Amino acid sequence: MQTDLSDSSFFNHKSVMTDEIMASLEHYPLIHNNQLKGIDATLGGGGHSFNLLRKYSELNIIGLDQDPFARISASKKLDEFKNRIDIRASNFADFVPKEKVSFVIADLGVNSNQIDDPKRGFSFQKDGPLDMRMNPLLEVDAEKLIEALNEKDLANLIYKYGDERLSRKIARKIKLDLKENGKYSGTKELAYSIAGCFPPKQRYKKIHPATRTFQALRIAVNKEIEVLEKFLQAVPEWLLPGGIISIISFHSLEDRLVKSSFKNDQRLKNLTKKPITPSEQEVEFNKRARSGKLRIAQLK
C-alpha cells in the first residue's frame, strides 16, 4: 500500500533548532542585503525556510528535497512566499546551483513524517513494509538490501552504521529467518526478531534493541554517508565570499564528517569548535531534537 501523494496532512514535521539556524546566518556580513539568496538543502516540511522567508523580506530560497511527500507539504506551507521559494526535486548531493548564494542550511537525517507514516517503513512503532527509502524512486529498499547481502556483509553494515555490538548475532538471525521463513511481514516482525538476539533483561529498556539496526539499514538504503561526503566536498563552491553553511546532524557518523570537513577544508573558516545543541526548552517540547548538533562554517 502506498501513501497518497495528494494527502500531506500526515506531514507534521517540527523543524529542529530554528532559532539557532536563524542566528547562524547573522555571521554573513551582507545578511540584510536586498539581493539575499540561499539554499535549504533539506527542505522537509519547510519549517526553516518559512522562518527565514518571514524574517528577510527580500530573501529568495531554493529548497531541495528528494521526498515528493515533503515537497508537496512544503509547497503548501510556503504558499504565501511562492514568489520567493523555488522547490526542486533533488538530493543535495546531486544539485549544482547556477549561481552562488549567501548561505546553505541542511537539517540531516530522517524527518518526523517519515518516521510517523508506517507505510514508509522507517519505524517499528507501527507495522509497515521494510522500505526506509527517503526517495521512493530508489530501486533498493530495506527488504531487498537484507536479502541481497550475505551474513558477513550484513553484520559489517549493522556494526558500521549502527555501532551495534551484537551485529554478527543479529545478521545471523536475519539471514536464518529469511532462509527458513521467507520475507519478513513488516517492520514489527523484523524488530521482534532482532530483540530476540538480546538477553531478556535488555529487551525492555528505554531504547528498543532494534533501534541501532534500523538506523544502520536506513543509512545504507539511502546511502546517507556517501551523499553527505559528496555534499560537504561540493558545498563551499555554492557560496559567495563570506557565505555561511549551517548543518544540523543527528548521529555521530554524520557529526564526525561535518566536524572534520569544517576543520580541515582550507576553503572554510570553522565557526563552531564545539557543536551547538538544542535548548532544554526545545528538547522538552520536541524529544526528537535532543540529539541534534549544529555546526557552522564560513567561506573565506
Swiss-Prot record:
Coarse class of the protein's main subcellular location: cytoplasm
Any one GO molecular-function label of the UniProt entry: rRNA (cytosine-N4-)-methyltransferase activity
Any Pfam family matching the protein: Methyltransf_5
Listed NCBIfam families: 16S rRNA (cytosine(1402)-N(4))-methyltransferase RsmH
EC number, UniProt record: 2.1.1.199
Record's protein name: Ribosomal RNA small subunit methyltransferase H
GO terms classed as biological process: rRNA base methylation
Binding site for S-adenosyl-L-methionine: G46, G47, H48, D65, F92, D107, Q114
Keywords noted in UniProt: Cytoplasm, Methyltransferase, rRNA processing, S-adenosyl-L-methionine, Transferase
Lineage: Bacteria, Bacillati, Cyanobacteriota, Cyanophyceae, Synechococcales
Localization, UniProt: Cytoplasm
Family: Belongs to the methyltransferase superfamily. RsmH family.
Gene Ontology CC: one annotated term: cytoplasm
Reaction(s) the record says it catalyses: cytidine(1402) in 16S rRNA + S-adenosyl-L-methionine = N(4)-methylcytidine(1402) in 16S rRNA + S-adenosyl-L-homocysteine + H(+)
Residue stretches in coiled coil: none
Purpose of the protein: Specifically methylates the N4 position of cytidine in position 1402 (C1402) of 16S rRNA.
Organism: Prochlorococcus marinus (strain MIT 9215)
